Amino acid sequence: MSSLRLLISDSYDPWFNLAVEECIFRQMPTTQRVLFLWRNAETVVIGRAQNPWKECNTRRMEEDGIKLARRSSGGGAVFHDLGNTCFTFMAGKPEYDKSVSTQIVLDALSALGLKASASGRNDLVVETADGVRKVSGSAYRETKDRGFHHGTLLLNADLNRLADYLNPDIKKLQAKGITSVRSRVANLVELLPSVDHQVICQAVTQAFFDYFGEQCEPEIISPSAYPDLPGFSEQFARQSSWEWNFGQAPDFSHLLDNRFTWGGIELHFDVERGVIIRAQVYTDSLNPAPLEALACALQGTAYRPENMAATCQALITAFPEQQNELQELAEWLEQSLR
C-alpha cells in the first residue's frame, strides 16, 4: 500500500479548500505523505496572525465581491484568483522537511523547462530579462508530530489586482499584527506560454511520485463530492465564519474622525478579537450626550460596519431630537469601516 495520498479539489471556494487542508492535516496518519492541489476564485488570503483591516482594502473587497480567508499558517497576505495554482505538502515528523517539498516544486518547473531557485523569504524565483522575479510564495505550519508546506504558483494571475486589495485604505490603525512585504512577481505564462493549471498539476504530481518512488490514485473532491473527512462540515463552517476570518485579528486601535455641520467628532476604538472593548468620543458638538451614549453602547460590539451603524441608530429612541445627526453618524460609520 502506497504511503502517498493525492487530493485534487474541483472547488474554487477558498473556505472549502482551506477546510479540506485543515482536516487532512489534523487527521492524516503520520506515516503518510500528502499532496493537495487546489485553486481559489478571487480571494485575499491572510496569515494566521494578520489584521484584515490593516492588510486589506476591505471596502473595495466588499464592492467587488472578493472573499477574505484566514489560513492557519503564518506569513503575509496574498491575492488568489484562478491564475494561481495552490499546493500543499504534508508529512509526519521526523520525515517532514520543507526543503523536500520545495525541491519537488523546483523539479516540476524544471521538467517544464524552467529553471527556478529558492530565495530568502520562502519564495521561488526565476531570472528574467527584467531581473529576478518571484513566481511562487509559501507558508508553513508545524505541530508536535507533523508539518505542512503550502504555497502558490503564479500561472496567469491578474497581477494588477494585487495592489487593489492588499494596499489598505488610509486608516489610522496602530496594529500589533504583521504587515505583508510586497514582492516583485511574474507569471509563469510569460516564461512558459503553454502552461496552465492542469499542466502544472500534472508536473507537480509527477515530481511528487518520482521523488518518493511511489504512486497513488488521485481523490477528486468538490462541494458535490465531499471529502471523507470526519468533522469536515464543522470545519468548513468555522473557516467561512466572520469570527475566524475577522475576529481572530490581533488586537489593534483605530481612530475615526470627521466634521459634520453640527460639530466635529473623534472616535477612538480598542479592538480585541474583533470586538470593541473600549470606545472614547471627543466632540465640540453643543449636545454631546448622544455621542457619549454611543461610545458606551459600542463597547462589546463586534467591529463590523453594520453592527456599529445599528448601535448608532438604536439611540434614536433615546435621543429623538438628534435623529438626523445620529442617522448621519450611522451612515458615516458604516461607510468609513468598509
Swiss-Prot record:
Q: What reaction gets catalysed by this protein?
A: L-lysyl-[lipoyl-carrier protein] + (R)-lipoate + ATP = N(6)-[(R)-lipoyl]-L-lysyl-[lipoyl-carrier protein] + AMP + diphosphate + H(+)
Mind telling me which Pfam families this protein's record contains? Lip_prot_lig_C, LplA-B_cat
What residues bind (R)-lipoate, as annotated? 134
Give the binding site residues for ATP.
71, 76-79, 134
Keyword Nuclease (UniProt): no
Grouped into one coarse class, the protein's main location is: cytoplasm
Name the enzyme group at the top EC level.
Answer: ligase
EC number assigned by the record: 6.3.1.20
Gene Ontology cellular-component terms for this entry are: cytosol
Single Gene Ontology MF annotation: ATP binding
Q: Which GO terms describe its biological process?
A: protein modification process
Domain BPL/LPL catalytic: from-to ranges: 29-216
Q: In which pathway does it act?
A: Protein modification; protein lipoylation via exogenous pathway; protein N(6)-(lipoyl)lysine from lipoate: step 1/2; Protein modification; protein lipoylation via exogenous pathway; protein N(6)-(lipoyl)lysine from lipoate: step 2/2
Q: Which UniProt keywords apply?
A: ATP-binding, Cytoplasm, Ligase, Nucleotide-binding
By sequence similarity, the record places it as follows:
Belongs to the LplA family.
What is the additional note? In the transfer reaction, the free carboxyl group of lipoic acid is attached via an amide linkage to the epsilon-amino group of a specific lysine residue of lipoyl domains of lipoate-dependent enzymes.
Its assembly, as annotated, is: Monomer.
Q: What does this protein do?
A: Catalyzes both the ATP-dependent activation of exogenously supplied lipoate to lipoyl-AMP and the transfer of the activated lipoyl onto the lipoyl domains of lipoate-dependent enzymes.
Q: What is this protein called?
A: Lipoate-protein ligase A
Q: Which organism is it from?
A: Pectobacterium carotovorum subsp. carotovorum (strain PC1)
